[in-house]
A protein has these predicted regions:
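Conserved histidine-centered catalytic loops in small-molecule metabolism enzymes
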Residues: 191-222
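Positively charged, low-complexity/disordered segments
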Residues: 1-2
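Flexible, gly/pro- and Lys/Arg-enriched active-site loops
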Residues: 165-202
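Active-site proximal loops enriched in glycine and acidic residues that flank catalytic Cys/His/Asp
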Residues: 107, 154-156, 172-175, 220
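Active-site ligand-binding patch in enzyme domains
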Residues: 5-9, 13-149, 157-160
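Helical hairpin unit composed of two closely spaced alpha helices linked by a short loop
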Residues: 140, 147-149, 154, 165, ...
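Residue-level detector of flexible, active-site-proximal loop/helix-junction positions
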Residues: 88-90, 110-112, 128, 178, ...
Length: 222
């Protein structure tokens, strides 16, 4: 599963107010569309949905010419959109549930609503620590549905939780040549460390300039 953070030079993903549009360039956003098009599913959280009302779909006009040649408009397949929503906060008002293609809500209890699109629920237990969905069981359920390539776009806490559970196969970071300052929101949120030996380590798989930004692809060393 691939996790995507977008960052400034000082490792920030948004201002303290939550403003993040746009830290990175149009070239980086086009590159993200290319990755989305290749994924079986896109995974995000109810917190991201409520904060940004994102579409989390593939926009053909935003793809590179190379990817357009592989995926003609008439045969474009939308990845399944998956939202962790343990508190049933996502409603039919959000665009992610209204667009073409399948949308799955990973919840701990069912709540029937009049969805406009192809929306269904996956019911899972909590993780035992808080009221959040058990992410390991979620990935197992997705595997049973033959959803094997999951592209993650979320905030720092969810990305950190996936990393600590060993559920990230690749971490892709787009770094913009900007500095957002001390009060801005961080890249990843993980448990406090008591020594440097506990710090997660990575292997740099690739480093590429995308427009004015840098894309770093990292493999966790679990």
């Amino acid at each position: 599963h691939d996790a995507l953070p977008i960052s400034s030079l000082d490792g920030k993903t948004a201002l303290a107010s939550g403003e993040s549009q746009w830290i990175t360039s149009n070239a980086s956003r086009q590159d993200v569309q290319n990755f989305r098009a290749q994924a079986s599913a896109i995974l995000t959280t109810s917190a991201t949905v409520l904060a940004d009302d994102p579409a989390m779909n593939v926009r053909w006009e935003a793809l590179s010419d190379e990817i357009k040649a592989i995926y003609p408009l008439e045969s474009l397949r939308q990845p399944i959109r998956i939202i962790t929503d343990s508190q049933n906060r996502v409603t039919p008002d959000y665009k992610i549930t209204q667009l073409a293609g399948e949308c799955l809500l990973a919840r701990t209890h069912s709540q029937q609503e009049a969805w406009q699109g192809d929306v269904s629920e996956i019911l899972l237990p909590t993780n035992g620590k808080n009221s959040s969905v058990d992410l390991v069981l979620l990935m197992m359920q997705l595997g049973k549905r033959n959803i094997n390539s999951v592209w993650v776009e979320s905030g720092a806490h969810f990305a950190g939780a996936l990393l600590e559970l060993g559920l990230v196969d690749e971490l892709i970071i787009y770094i913009a040549p900007k500095i957002l300052g001390n009060d801005a929101r961080g890249l990843l949120s993980i448990s406090p460390l008591s020594s440097l030996s506990e710090a997660p380590e990575f292997t740099i798989d690739s480093l590429q300039q995308i427009g004015p930004d840098i894309r770093v692809c990292l493999k966790p060393r679990y």
